[in-house]
């Protein structure tokens, strides 16, 4: 007797798609409306696990980490209005960082929504500002069509988040055994730009007297390091990265690499002003500054010839006119451009390359000297942590087997310089950050990264390290419960200075930029206010982690203790399916209140820190002078 086919429900359309695309997780916080879909993860034949998180912004952050590793859409399941509302911080990050996500939101019963029932609202309006497409399913019959479109659109270049609200009773309706989603349309991202426009861009680059390259996130997502390195060599051009790059957009052992753009108006202007031609490649977030005055002039001086290459029409000429605008995939298009420029390279390229090689050697010595100074300091400087991590990666032969998740926002430069983001040891996705700047992204992301064994750019996630400031870590410490529950071995490093130090630097910038300007004579009572500190009481992170997930760890107080502590933490997470926490006591920067002076510790720690960018070196003598000029090398500002 023939076996009767198992019953299928409308929720199974979701699992049809996940099986086809090889997606193995759904992230979320359980709610009654979501149970029909969550129940589908209980069936082994669906091949999907439900990852329980304790807050929706953790769920979407974890999904972002998963999507970054696989290159496929990650799926989040949220609960009516509060569910999507709780995701907004990281949804904004996902939108700015071009993350392929599909957010499924279980709406209240369709026949009831108009009557404004408990928790219901216009969900599409909540989500659509930060999604490529947002839609609420109108009938159960359109569910397979809508789901196919959602996953197609999330993957289509440039990738991004998509939102679908589904009245929850639709998911429980029985469907026929042969009612399935036929497939998901996949649009290839590998398309080349228009040949005529490529020739136009090549001609402009060949005539450049002092070219500059700005590399945005689309470079890293395209896995286009070698192609951009080739162009930098041909042009003799320094390469700066998008401020708050989501990935490593250029290898840091290439002498053309100059770190990220400054996060200030005059700082950006100083980068561009000495160059006649700027090649802006995959650069989406073009105004990552927080203080701007039109009287100070545009971020890119008007006499700079701008050439664009991007897979997003929105990002081409978004803020300023481009003399040449190539719409195409970066990895597919750059070789065509490179071949043309190679036939007619700009004058002086060889000389500029020689100068940059010398500058790279000098930069290495400066960082070695800075590390030696840091080892003699009373408290821990971030460079000591970064150097210790690099040592572990090298000694344990973890090349292409590590992912560094960065949210130590007061101290990006040491990690960006010392960790081996090189062709031999890493790939663009070996570095994880976000372009949006909404804090609290990294700890959730570490979950999704560690869940995926392999990254699509031929890397592994054997070692996942998350460096995060103490302020940022307090957004979602519930992460530690999920890490323990799912047995994820992640090394968490809290750079703990008991304050919102980045905001203190931001306050200095505001005062310097506006404090004496007509109509803006406001000045704070102190530059070091108590409300920007985290003390009285100081948070005991080890106790919090222990209580939420039984996570072990230790406090580290001096530079001499860092190397052994980092090695212990790395060994622990590699050998155990459990996370480990290092509470690193970073030098406290706040003097006794009230004060309007800058403490010596800040001067020593930051002003002696070598700039990553040696081509456009900025050398002021103190932090307030840096703020006055709007040029704080290596220190981005977030409000």
Regions found by a protein language model. Give the residues of each.
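N-terminal alpha/beta PP-like core and its mobile active-site loop of ThDP/TPP-dependent enzymes
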Residues: 2-345, 392, 456, 461, ...
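Phosphate/pyrophosphate-binding active-site segments
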Residues: 1-6, 141, 177-179, 302-408, ...
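Active-site diphosphate/adenylate-binding microenvironment
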Residues: 11-14, 19-24, 29-32, 37-42, ...
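A glycine-rich phosphate-binding loop feature that marks nucleotide/adenosyl-phosphate handling sites
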Residues: 165-170, 409-411, 585-586
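Thiamine diphosphate
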Residues: 104, 113-119, 263, 272-274, ...
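Generic recognition of flexible, low-complexity loop/linker segments
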Residues: 14, 151, 199-202, 227-228, ...
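Basic phosphate/pyrophosphate-binding loop/patch that engages nucleotide-derived ligands
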Residues: 156, 397-399, 484-490
